[in-house]
Amino acid sequence: MATAARQGMGLNPVTRSACIESMILRVSVVFGTALLLGCASAPARSGAPTDATPAALPASEGGPATAAVAPPPLRWPVRTVPHVDLWLHAFAMLSDDTASVPLYRRGYRDSITVLKNQRNLLTALDGNREVLRRGLQRGSYLDAQFLPFAYGSWDELRATAEQFLQWGGDVRRAPSREVAVRLQPFAALFPGSNDREWLRLFLTGVDDEGARFLLVEHQRQLRERAPTITAVDSLWQRVYRDKFERFLNNTGLRQGDLVLSLPIGGEGRTGPGYTGRVMVAVTYPARPADAAQVLYVFAHEATGALVGPAVSDNTTPAQQRAGVAAQFVSSGQVQAGAMLLARIAPELLDGYQRYYLAQSGQRVTGDVRALFDRTFTLPAIIREALARQIDIVLSGI
């Protein structure tokens, strides 16, 4: 990622997916320890994460009020996490996202800009956009997208960031080891005074954006999309979680949270969450009829870690230096999701291919599979390596 050419958000179409994979691995290392020390639970607050399925059954009618019995916890509940959306929304509004599979939902920034213009609304994030955008281009802040995963609310995230800034980024000033560990991800991402000044300005913008616009707008959209999350939850828990289960178990993903996120499109986010489980943030479709899009992006994310090794083992150092290998990673991540679905849920494959073609801006006509393979091209040797690896995972070897 350090050598990636900067473009808007900070990544060009060739290197963006390679950096995402590398980013996920680094974020897991940076945040893993922090999650073990005090981030695994958080009190419920206004705007706190919500689950699609209740955590406990109500008492039976006429029975004792205290007799409610909780069902076994869902291994992969479907959730929304407002402060994750707020944070990703802010990054999306600062980004010129021109990747072939956009880092955010296609057209997201433009749609929000139109909405705010209609309301004649200008927040601190808008007012400081150019300064923040230039800083984002210069700095290596892409990993900061994952910071909210480690916190149960915006208040907790903001308080930790403000502590970090108050102490000038010196984690040694923390009053305890636990606090120092919580500050360490910020120290890794914002080591210099210029980095911390960017973070200070960004926090101010995010806070104002949330208070004056996004959190209310977010709740409005969640109400409008309530039938969608119900459809997604039903499709996932009743049909497809079992189909994904073997792959998830054999890749260490037995427990997790499936987070529906409004700013996200075909490029999800995966990282350790404040629940102590992995969080996979995926797109939040507007219509119940599009609920399967969640499964498409989840398949893309679930297979992402297999792609880097398959590419690096089958490319030359010269190809890696020239950026060719990074391009193969980008295509490989899309192809790997298709390969997994072909094995565990072939009825989803055509929809998956159409979805990612649309994400890449392709007009879908004629032979969908041929167009998909041309758009996300891979050498046969890498394709075969990915297929073998997916077969190995599914066989439990």
Describe the function of each predicted region.
Residues E267-A292:
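Active-site scaffold of zinc-dependent metalloenzymes
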Residues P49-G168, T377, I381:
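N-terminal mature-domain "stem" immediately C-terminal to a signal peptide or N-terminal signal-anchor/transmembrane
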